Amino acid sequence: MSSAQNIKKSILAPVLDNNPIALQVLGVCSALAVTTKLETAFVMTLAVTFVTALSNFFVSVIRNHIPNSVRIIVQMAIIASLVIVVDQILKAYLYDISKQLSVFVGLIITNCIVMGRAEAFAMKSAPVPSLIDGIGNGLGYGFVLITVGFFRELFGSGKLFGMEVLPLVNNGGWYQPNGLMLLAPSAFFLIGFMIWAIRTFKPEQVEAKE
C-alpha cells in the first residue's frame, strides 16, 4: 500500500469504519455536554484534534526513552501541557466559547480517545504516522460531535451557528423550538441513531451473538 493510501486510510477510517464514539464508545461525556450548539461542537472538535495529533506525535518521538513504569504519567503530562495551551488560546481569542465549554476543555486530559491513541498507537509507531492517526481520530470524534450538534441546535433552537434558520414563532414564524433537543438525553438518542445507521450500512461492525 502506498504512502498516500496509508495517510488516506488513517484519516478516513476513524470516521465510519472505526469511529471512536460510534464503534469504540469513547468520549461520550463531552459529546453530550458540548453539542447543544454547532459552534461549541466545532471548536471542541478542533481542540481534541489538536491535542490528539500533537500528543501522539510527541509521545512517539520520545517513546524509546520512556521507562515502561512511568509511560502513562509521561503521556498525561504531554496531554495536559497541550490542553493548557488550547485552554489559554480559547480564553484569549474565543472567550465566550471558552465559557460555554467550561470544564470540558480541561477534561480533554482524561478523554479516553486521546489517552487510548497515545498508548495503543503512538507508543508503537513512528512520529508522522502517529500525527496522522491523531488527526484521523480527532476528525472521527468531530464527525459525531458536529452531526449531533447540527440536529440539536437546528431543532432545539431553530438556529445554526447562532443564526436563525427556521422562522421562530417568537419572531412571527412557524417553528416552535423543541426544548428536549437541548437536554442531554437527546444526544444519547442521536448518537444511538448514528450507530444504528452506520451499522446498517456496515454490518461487519455488528457484534456477533453469544
Swiss-Prot record:
GO biological process, one term: sodium ion transport
Pfam families the record matches: Rnf-Nqr (PF02508)
Cellular component, GO, one term: plasma membrane
Enzyme class, broadest EC rank: translocase
Molecular-function GO terms, alphabetical: oxidoreductase activity, acting on NAD(P)H, quinone or similar compound as acceptor
Entry's localization field: Cell inner membrane
Record keyword Cell membrane present: yes
Transmembrane segments: 42-62, 72-92, 103-123, 131-151, 178-198
Key words, A-Z: Cell inner membrane, Cell membrane, Ion transport, Membrane, NAD, Sodium, Sodium transport, Translocase, Transmembrane, Transmembrane helix, Transport, Ubiquinone
Coiled coil: none
Catalytic reaction list: a ubiquinone + n Na(+)(in) + NADH + H(+) = a ubiquinol + n Na(+)(out) + NAD(+)
Primary site of residence: membrane
Stretch forming the signal peptide: none
Membrane topology: Multi-pass membrane protein
EC number(s) reported in the record: 7.2.1.1
Annotated function: NQR complex catalyzes the reduction of ubiquinone-1 to ubiquinol by two successive reactions, coupled with the transport of Na(+) ions from the cytoplasm to the periplasm. NqrA to NqrE are probably involved in the second step, the conversion of ubisemiquinone to ubiquinol.
Assembly description: Composed of six subunits; NqrA, NqrB, NqrC, NqrD, NqrE and NqrF.
HAMAP family given in the database record: NqrD
Entry-linked NCBIfam families: nqrD, PRK09292.1, PRK12405.1
Family: Belongs to the NqrDE/RnfAE family.
Protein name: Na(+)-translocating NADH-quinone reductase subunit D
